[in-house]
Design a protein with these regions (language model features):
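Bacterial Sec-dependent N-terminal signal peptides
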Residues: 1-20
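A composition-driven surface/loop motif
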Residues: 20-137
């Protein structure tokens, strides 16, 4: 009986574990999810301050650097109207892949004095049948 109760409690507790939500884009080859969106600098190759606001769909790069080999620094697969917000001086260094690759509508938006430098051995920005808008950069 005791084992039976333990099994029931274990099964019920696993039912309450929520699955992580994916937001439809990747940073440095890693899905941005409900588990990691507040601090994307935990991803290997990402430094500075990088975070995502799911309510406004804004990915903020704040004096950030993304350095990767073999994957895109930012890959927007299905996040419609993603805004890449630039604060301060930002750098993307990518080898063997496109720096920013968009499959959905994306806006790269800066404020006064913000910059984004893309260094790449292939192409800096690749957009596949989707609008890309660059504002105040």
């Amino acid at each position: 009986m005791r084992i039976f109760l333990v099994l029931i409690v274990m099964m019920m507790s696993s039912a309450f574990v929520m699955a992580q939500e994916k937001y439809g884009f990747k940073v440095a080859g890693v899905d941005v999810t409900s588990d990691n969106y507040l601090d994307l600098t935990e991803i290997n190759g990402v430094s500075g301050k990088v975070y995502f606001d799911p309510n406004t769909r804004a990915l903020t790069l704040d004096n950030a650097t993304i350095e990767v080999d073999g994957c895109n620094a930012i890959l927007n697969e299905t996040c419609r109207n993603l805004v890449i917000e630039l604060l301060g001086t930002n750098t993307i260094n990518v080898t063997n892949s496109a720096g920013i690759y968009t499959c959905e509508s994306t806006v790269i938006m800066g404020n006064s004095g913000s910059t984004l430098t893309l260094k790449n051995d292939r192409c800096a920005v690749l957009f596949e049948g989707s609008p890309l808008e660059i504002v105040n950069c």
